[in-house]
Every structure is written in C-alpha cells, then in structure tokens.
Amino acid sequence: MSRRKVCRFTVDGVKEIDYKDVNKLKAYITETGKIVPSRVTGTSAKYQRQLATAIKRARFLALLPYCDRHFN
C-alpha cells in the first residue's frame, strides 16, 4: 500500500503561497512547464488553487517559463 500524500503547505502552516518564491513553485511544475495535479503532489484543494494562481502570475511576470524551450 502506498503512503498517503500530505499537503506540504498545511504541514508548514503557510497562509498564502507567494508568486515570488520561484524555487518553491518550480517543484510543482513538470519539465514541460505544466502544473502538476494535486492527486500527484498531495496538495489540498485550497492550496492547489493558490498554487495555480501563483504559478500563472509568475509566468506572466516572466519569473517562470510557460514551456521548457522555444522552437524556431
């Protein structure tokens, strides 16, 4: 049996996910630039919504890439 996934944000007592914390956000993005779903990471629904918003803001401000690389 697999271990139950726990939400890291709940355990750490995070109130709100910051879009400027790029290193933490990178852990929730695949190599291709997609947001990892909560069923894989174990993130609760509340924090998954905040995470998606923070990643989208960071992408818009060019702190994170939209995809892994650009083709010519």
UniProtKB/Swiss-Prot annotation:
The gene is rpsR. SUPFAM superfamilies: Ribosomal protein S18. Binds as a heterodimer with protein bS6 to the central domain of the 16S rRNA, where it helps stabilize the platform of the 30S subunit. Belongs to the bacterial ribosomal protein bS18 family. Pfam families: Ribosomal_S18. Coiled coil: none annotated. GO terms for molecular function: small ribosomal subunit rRNA binding; structural constituent of ribosome. This is Small ribosomal subunit protein bS18. Keywords: Ribonucleoprotein, Ribosomal protein, RNA-binding, rRNA-binding. Gene3D superfamilies: Ribosomal protein S18 (4.10.640.10). The keyword Protease does not apply. It comes from Francisella philomiragia subsp. philomiragia (strain ATCC 25017 / CCUG 19701 / FSC 153 / O#319-036). GO terms for cellular component: cytosolic small ribosomal subunit. Part of the 30S ribosomal subunit. Forms a tight heterodimer with protein bS6. It comes from the Bacteria. HAMAP family: Ribosomal_bS18 (MF_00270). InterPro entries: Ribosomal_bS18 (IPR001648), Ribosomal_bS18_CS (IPR018275), Ribosomal_bS18_sf (IPR036870). The keyword Membrane does not apply. GO terms for biological process: translation.
